[in-house]
C-alpha cells in the first residue's frame, strides 16, 4: 500500500516528534550523569578527561559522518547512531573506572557525531522540496520548544526516580540510565516509522561507492565554509560557545554538589531545576520569531550570547543553592532562544542540499571540540584554582563569540539590500 504523500505540515510534525524523542532520554541523564561519575570516585579533573574522550571521538568522526549522511541517507545514519547510544547506556550502568567511563563517553561521541545534522537536514531539504519558501526558522523555534519540554519531562522523571529509588539493590543514580535505555529504543522505532526518505544510494553504484563519495563531500563542505564569511563566523562562534558550555554542563552541577555537600541531594535538586530550565529554554525558543521581527537575527544572536555569558558569571558569584539554581535556569532560557537563531543563520547560509548535513556537522564539530577543550582546560583550572575561577573563565570565552553573529547577520542582509 502506497503511503499518502507528505505535506509541509506533516513533515514539520514528524520532525518535531522525532526531535522530542531524540532528547527525552537525554533529559533522564542530565541530572545524574556528572554526579554518577563523581560518585564513582573521579575528580573534577578526571571528569574533564572522561568528557574529553567524547570530544576526541567527535573531533575525528564528525565531518566524515556528516558526509556519510549526505552520501547514504539521513535515516540510515540516525539508526546507526542510536545503536551506539544504546551500547553506551548499557555500559554506563556498570562502568565504575576511568577507562570504562572513557569508553562510555567515546561511544556517546560516536553517537553524537552520527546524530548531529541528519534530522535537521532531512527536515530542511524535505520541506523545501515541497515548498521552497517553507518557514524553517519557525520550525527550528518550535523544535527548540519541543526539546525544552522533552528535556524537562525527562529531568523531572529522573528526579522522581532518584528520590523514590524504586528498584531495590540498584544505585538510585543508575535508575534514570535504565529509563533512558528504554526510551532510546522507542526513538529507534519512531525513526523507522516516521522518517521517509528517498534512497541516496543508486542501484547501479551501491553502498560502497556511495561511501567512497564521503571524502569529496567533506572537502567540498570545508571549501564552502572557508569561502563564506557567514559560515566561518558561525562555526567559530560555536567553538567559543562549546568551551564556555563546559562551565554550565559540567562545572555547575559540581558546584551545586559542593554547596549541598551531598551528590544524591544535588541530583534530586537538579531534576526539577533542569525541568524548569528546559521549560524556560523552550519558552526562549518560542519567542525567537518575535525577537527577529524586531531586530536582525545577527543582532539578536550577539545580545543573547552576551546575556548568557553574564548569567554564567552570576553562577560563579552565587553563594547558595537557590541563587545557583535560579541563574542556571536563566542561562538555559537564554540558550533556548540563541540556538534557533544560530541554526537559522547556519541553514540560510548553506546553498547546496548536497552538503547540508556535512556543513551542519562542521558546525557541530567545532562546538564539540570547544567542549572537549573546555572539559580539559577548565577542569584542570578548577582543580588548580577553584570552580568559580573556571566558571568565570568559561563565561568570558563564551562572550568573545558574540560579535561574530553581527558578521553573520550583516553578510546575510547584504544581498537583499541590493535587490
Model segments located where?
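Helix-loop boundary and gating motifs at the non-cytosolic
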Residues: 2-60, 93, 229-278
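C-terminal transmembrane bundle of multi-pass solute transporters/carriers
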Residues: 3, 50, 54, 59-67, ...
Amino acid at each position: 500500500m502506497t503511503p499518502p504523500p507528505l505535506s509541509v505540515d506533516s513533515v514539520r510534525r514528524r520532525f518535531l516528534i522525532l526531535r522530542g524523542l531524540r532528547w527525552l532520554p537525554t533529559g533522564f541523564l542530565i541530572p545524574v550523569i556528572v554526579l554518577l561519575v563523581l560518585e564513582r570516585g573521579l575528580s573534577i579533573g578526571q571528569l574533564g578527561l572522561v568528557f574529553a574522550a567524547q570530544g576526541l571521538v567527535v573531533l575525528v568522526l564528525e565531518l566524515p559522518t556528516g558526509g556519510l549522511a549526505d552520501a547514504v541517507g539521513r535515516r540510515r545514519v540516525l539508526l546507526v547512531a542510536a545503536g551506539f547510544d544504546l551500547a553506551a547506556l548499557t555500559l554506563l550502568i556498570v562502568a565504575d573506572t576511568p577507562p570504562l567511563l572513557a569508553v562510555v563517553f567515546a561511544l556517546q561521541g560516536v553517537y553524537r557525531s552520527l546524530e548531529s545534522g541528519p534530522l535537521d537536514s532531512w527536515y530542511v531539504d524535505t520541506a523545501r522540496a515541497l515548498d521552497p519558501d517553507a518557514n524553517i526558522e519557525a520550525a527550528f523555534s518550535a523544535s527548540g520548544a519541543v526539546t525544552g519540554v522533552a528535556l524537562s519531562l525527562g529531568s523531572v522523571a529522573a528526579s522522581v526516580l532518584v528520590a523514590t529509588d524504586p528498584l531495590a539493590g540498584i544505585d538510585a543514580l543508575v535508575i534514570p540510565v535504565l529509563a533512558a535505555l528504554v526510551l532510546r529504543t522507542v526513538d529507534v522505532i519512531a525513526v523507522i516509522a516516521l522518517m521517509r526518505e528517498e534512497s541516496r544510494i543508486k542501484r547501479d553504484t551501491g553502498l560502497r561507492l556511495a561511501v567512497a563519495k564521503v571524502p569529496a563531500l567533506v572537502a567540498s563542505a570545508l571549501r564552502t565554509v572557508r569561502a563564506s564569511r557567514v559560515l566561518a563566523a558561525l562555526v567559530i562562534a560555536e567553538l567559543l560557545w562549546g568551551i564556555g558550555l563546559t562551565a554550565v554542563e559540567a562545572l555547575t552541577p559540581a558546584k551545586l554538589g559542593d554547596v549541598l555537600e551531598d551528590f544524591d541531594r544535588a541530583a534530586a535538586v537538579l531534576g526539577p531545576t533542569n525541568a524548569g530550565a528546559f521549560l524556560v529554554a523552550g519558552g526562549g525558543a518560542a519567542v525567537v520569531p518575535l525577537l527577529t521581527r524586531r531586530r536582525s537575527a545577527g543582532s539578536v544572536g550577539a545580545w543573547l550570547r552576551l546575556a548568557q555569558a553574564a548569567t554564567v558569571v552570576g553562577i560563579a558569584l552565587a553563594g547558595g543553592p537557590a541563587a545557583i539554581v535560579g541563574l542556571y535556569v536563566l542561562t538555559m532560557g537564554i540558550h533556548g532562544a540563541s540556538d534557533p537563531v544560530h541554526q537559522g543563520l547556519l541553514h540560510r547560509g548553506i546553498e547546496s542540499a548536497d552538503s547540508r548535513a556535512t556543513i551542519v556537522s562542521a558546525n557541530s564539530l567545532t562546538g564539540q571540540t570547544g567542549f572537549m577543550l573546555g572539559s580539559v582546560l577548565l577542569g584542570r583550572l578548577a582543580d588548580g584554582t577553584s570552580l568559580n575561577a573556571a566558571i568565570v573563565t568559561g563565561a568570558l570565552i563564551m562572550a568573545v563569540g558574540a560579535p561574530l553573529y553581527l558578521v553573520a547577520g550583516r553578510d546575510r542582509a547584504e544581498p537583499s539590500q541590493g535587490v
